[in-house]
Amino acid sequence: MNVRMFSLMVGIFSVLNTTQFFIFDLNQKTHICYEAKFSIYVDSKSELVTWTLFHRANISTGLSLTTIIIGCFLFYCIHKNIYMGLLIYAMWIITYELINFSIVLLLNGIIKDHFKTLSYLHWIFQISHMLLHFFCLPFIVKHAYNLYKESQTVGRKRRHRLCSTIAVNS
């Protein structure tokens, strides 16, 4: 298998994996009982934590949909041999995982003691998600580097051919 094929597999993996974790995030229960609205989180005095908890579904939706779109953009860039698109994908995955890690870190601090085992599940999901994404990044970067080197070689040949044509016409 060549680096291009690995990059395509990374794109497929990224879209499917992001979709899977997006579904997990949307189906996560934070309240139990309909009348009492018993929350698994304690009340926090931090505005950032409260805002993150309140807008978690919107943040997850925005990040996941952006990642899926950028994953599809990765397919296009691999097909058209655009190395800059592969680098954009790599930078986005790093940003995406750091934001998700920050959210898990913030929200695990306010989980009630009765639900602490749930925080371990959050950590396992987050760390496995990060490891899987970060394991794939070297293949993307290597393919981008190969495309960059290839474009430099083609540029030199084109300049050499253009200079030869101008010299013959003179």
UniProtKB/Swiss-Prot annotation:
Name of the protein described by the UniProt record: Transmembrane protein 217B
Positions in the Lumenal compartment: 22-58, 107-120
UniProt cross-references to InterPro entries, sorted A to Z: DUF4534
Major localization listed first in the record, in broad terms: membrane
Cytoplasmic side: 80-85, 142-170
Annotated localization: Membrane
Domain of life where this protein originates: Eukaryota
Note: Found in the 3'UTR of TMEM217/ AC Q8N7C4. Cotranscriptional with TMEM217 and seems to be only ever transcribed from the same promoter region.
